[in-house]
């Protein structure tokens, strides 16, 4: 059974692929994050990942099953075929990935929600005109080490403008720390999407709780 999209799912949004947890099994890492209370998981296996397509599919099936048991949405990054094969709850695409209109058409009738990365006012304005986008990921809010080709930093002031411009909920991405959560929440963002904050965390339970609490209003 798929998880239906609602803005609260963006509060503590964990993003990871095998490349983000070297020396660890992503299944074990996700189990820990689910137990801590993440509200969404995006499978983003790319960049320096060494998995074959067959290994990626097998890993994705296991991660999808874990999310289903926890009733947490399983989102696939930038791969419509994989999202459909895994019966994902959502798919997230970037400005340079598959055209979002093509993605929306491909998942029509499959109860898969769609997220789009937008880092400028022009990109948000364009997204507002496209039916079928459920949320926007905006950033990087701060400098990030997790994405080598990241867009220029927008800061919380820039994020606030993007949130005000968007007709759909916005999740903040990039360089997020626990200390920055209050300032991000003040922009009106629905939540934060993080990699390093949790993969490098010394207290996953506390840090996940901090994310959920910051965006609980």
From Swiss-Prot:
<feature type="binding site">
    <location>
        <position position="147"/>
    </location>
    <ligand>
        <name>4-amino-2-methyl-5-(diphosphooxymethyl)pyrimidine</name>
    </ligand>
</feature>
<keyword id="KW-0479">Metal-binding</keyword>
<comment type="function">
    <text>Condenses 4-methyl-5-(beta-hydroxyethyl)thiazole monophosphate (THZ-P) and 2-methyl-4-amino-5-hydroxymethyl pyrimidine pyrophosphate (HMP-PP) to form thiamine monophosphate (TMP).</text>
</comment>
<comment type="similarity">
    <text>Belongs to the thiamine-phosphate synthase family.</text>
</comment>
<feature type="binding site">
    <location>
        <begin position="195"/>
        <end position="196"/>
    </location>
    <ligand>
        <name>2-[(2R,5Z)-2-carboxy-4-methylthiazol-5(2H)-ylidene]ethyl phosphate</name>
    </ligand>
</feature>
<keyword id="KW-0808">Transferase</keyword>
<feature type="binding site">
    <location>
        <position position="117"/>
    </location>
    <ligand>
        <name>4-amino-2-methyl-5-(diphosphooxymethyl)pyrimidine</name>
    </ligand>
</feature>
<keyword id="KW-0460">Magnesium</keyword>
<dbReference type="InterPro" id="IPR022998">
    <property type="entry name" value="ThiamineP_synth_TenI"/>
</dbReference>
<feature type="binding site">
    <location>
        <position position="175"/>
    </location>
    <ligand>
        <name>2-[(2R,5Z)-2-carboxy-4-methylthiazol-5(2H)-ylidene]ethyl phosphate</name>
    </ligand>
</feature>
<dbReference type="GO" id="GO:0009229">
    <property type="term" value="P:thiamine diphosphate biosynthetic process"/>
</dbReference>
<dbReference type="InterPro" id="IPR013785">
    <property type="entry name" value="Aldolase_TIM"/>
</dbReference>
<feature type="binding site">
    <location>
        <position position="77"/>
    </location>
    <ligand>
        <name>4-amino-2-methyl-5-(diphosphooxymethyl)pyrimidine</name>
    </ligand>
</feature>
<dbReference type="GO" id="GO:0004789">
    <property type="term" value="F:thiamine-phosphate diphosphorylase activity"/>
</dbReference>
<feature type="binding site">
    <location>
        <position position="97"/>
    </location>
    <ligand>
        <name>Mg(2+)</name>
    </ligand>
</feature>
<protein>
    <recommendedName>
        <fullName>Thiamine-phosphate synthase</fullName>
        <ecNumber>2.5.1.3</ecNumber>
    </recommendedName>
</protein>
<dbReference type="InterPro" id="IPR036206">
    <property type="entry name" value="ThiamineP_synth_sf"/>
</dbReference>
<feature type="binding site">
    <location>
        <position position="78"/>
    </location>
    <ligand>
        <name>Mg(2+)</name>
    </ligand>
</feature>
<keyword id="KW-0784">Thiamine biosynthesis</keyword>
<feature type="binding site">
    <location>
        <begin position="144"/>
        <end position="146"/>
    </location>
    <ligand>
        <name>2-[(2R,5Z)-2-carboxy-4-methylthiazol-5(2H)-ylidene]ethyl phosphate</name>
    </ligand>
</feature>
<comment type="pathway">
    <text>Cofactor biosynthesis; thiamine diphosphate biosynthesis; thiamine phosphate from 4-amino-2-methyl-5-diphosphomethylpyrimidine and 4-methyl-5-(2-phosphoethyl)-thiazole: step 1/1.</text>
</comment>
<dbReference type="GO" id="GO:0000287">
    <property type="term" value="F:magnesium ion binding"/>
</dbReference>
<dbReference type="Pfam" id="PF02581">
    <property type="entry name" value="TMP-TENI"/>
</dbReference>
<dbReference type="GO" id="GO:0009228">
    <property type="term" value="P:thiamine biosynthetic process"/>
</dbReference>
<feature type="binding site">
    <location>
        <begin position="42"/>
        <end position="46"/>
    </location>
    <ligand>
        <name>4-amino-2-methyl-5-(diphosphooxymethyl)pyrimidine</name>
    </ligand>
</feature>
<dbReference type="GO" id="GO:0005737">
    <property type="term" value="C:cytoplasm"/>
</dbReference>
<dbReference type="InterPro" id="IPR034291">
    <property type="entry name" value="TMP_synthase"/>
</dbReference>
């Amino acid at each position: 059974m798929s998880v239906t999209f609602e803005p609260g799912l963006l509060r503590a949004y964990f993003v990871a692929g095998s490349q983000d947890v070297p020396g660890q099994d992503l299944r074990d890492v996700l189990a820990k994050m689910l137990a801590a209370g993440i509200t969404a998981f995006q499978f983003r296996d790319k960049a320096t990942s060494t998995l074959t397509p067959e290994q990626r599919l097998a890993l994705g099936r296991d991660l999808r099953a874990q999310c289903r048991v926890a009733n947490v949405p399983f989102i696939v990054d930038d791969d419509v075929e994989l999202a459909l094969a895994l019966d994902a709850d959502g798919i997230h695409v970037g400005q340079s990935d598959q055209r979002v209109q093509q993605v929306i058409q491909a998942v029509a009738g499959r109860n898969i929600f769609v997220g789009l990365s937008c880092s400028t006012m022009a990109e948000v304005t364009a997204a507002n005109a496209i039916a079928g986008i459920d949320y926007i990921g905006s950033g990087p809010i701060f400098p990030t080490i997790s994405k080598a080709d990241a867009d220029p930093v927008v800061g919380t002031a820039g994020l606030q403008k993007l949130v005000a411009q968007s007709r759909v909920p916005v999740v903040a991405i990039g360089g997020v720390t626990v200390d920055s959560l209050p300032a991000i929440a003040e922009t009106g963002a629905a939540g934060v999407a993080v990699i390093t904050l949790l993969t490098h965390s010394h207290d996953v339970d506390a840090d996940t709780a901090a994310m959920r609490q910051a965006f609980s209003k």
